[in-house]
Amino acid sequence: MFLGMPTLTHEEQQKAVEKIQHLMSEGMSSGEAIQLVAQELREKHTTRESVSIVFDDDND
């Protein structure tokens, strides 16, 4: 699976982590929180440089 993710500064990464932790503290699952924050980041950074991420879905 390939995903385009924007490159983030350390500060942006830290804010994303804090937002995910906050959402989880309010009862959202970790997967949902990560998905929500990732989507927000993609929308916010549509014009910035991005990197391709490859997930190996094989469960050997």
From Swiss-Prot:
| NCBIfam families xref list | PRK05114.1
Q: Which species does this protein come from?
A: Proteus mirabilis (strain HI4320)
Give the protein family. Belongs to the UPF0181 family.
Q: Write down what this protein is called.
A: UPF0181 protein PMI1604
- List each coiled-coil range: none
Q: List the disulfide bonds.
A: none
Annotated HAMAP family: UPF0181 (MF_00507)
